[in-house]
Amino acid sequence: MKKIRKGDRVVILSGNDKGRSGEVIKVNPGESKALVRGINMVKRHQRQTQKQEAGIISKEAPIHLSNLAIADPKDGKPTRVGFRMNADGGKVRFAKRSGELIDG
């Protein structure tokens, strides 16, 4: 089970966007990287296609998972993730900082 998943709210721990938070759009476990909405924006030169105009566009660049931490559901501060078994025998994630469940 992965600690960071698509849709999670994360806090950036290092880099230009340190301290900012955003939602995970995509996780690439093979490269240990994730895309976070509105974070680590880079400019790309776009070639013209039938659907898009040419020009310079801003898009998210991947961030290494070691530079991300789950935001605590209680107060939004960075927390580590733990796993515990629920009553049904399924594995659920919880915030070690507050004990709150991350999986609804």
UniProtKB/Swiss-Prot annotation:
It holds the Pfam family KOW. PROSITE patterns: RIBOSOMAL_L24 (PS01108). Keywords: Ribonucleoprotein, Ribosomal protein, RNA-binding, rRNA-binding. One of its GO terms (cellular component) is ribosome. GO terms for biological process: translation. GO terms for molecular function: rRNA binding; structural constituent of ribosome. InterPro entries: KOW (IPR005824), Rib_uL2_dom2 (IPR014722), Ribosomal_uL24 (IPR003256), Ribosomal_uL24_CS (IPR005825), Ribosomal_uL24_KOW (IPR041988), Translation_prot_SH3-like_sf (IPR008991). Belongs to the universal ribosomal protein uL24 family. PANTHER family: MITOCHONDRIAL RIBOSOMAL PROTEIN L24. One of two assembly initiator proteins, it binds directly to the 5'-end of the 23S rRNA, where it nucleates assembly of the 50S subunit. One of the proteins that surrounds the polypeptide exit tunnel on the outside of the subunit. Part of the 50S ribosomal subunit. This is Large ribosomal subunit protein uL24. It comes from Bartonella bacilliformis (strain ATCC 35685 / KC583 / Herrer 020/F12,63). The lineage of its organism: Bacteria, Pseudomonadati, Pseudomonadota, Alphaproteobacteria, Hyphomicrobiales.
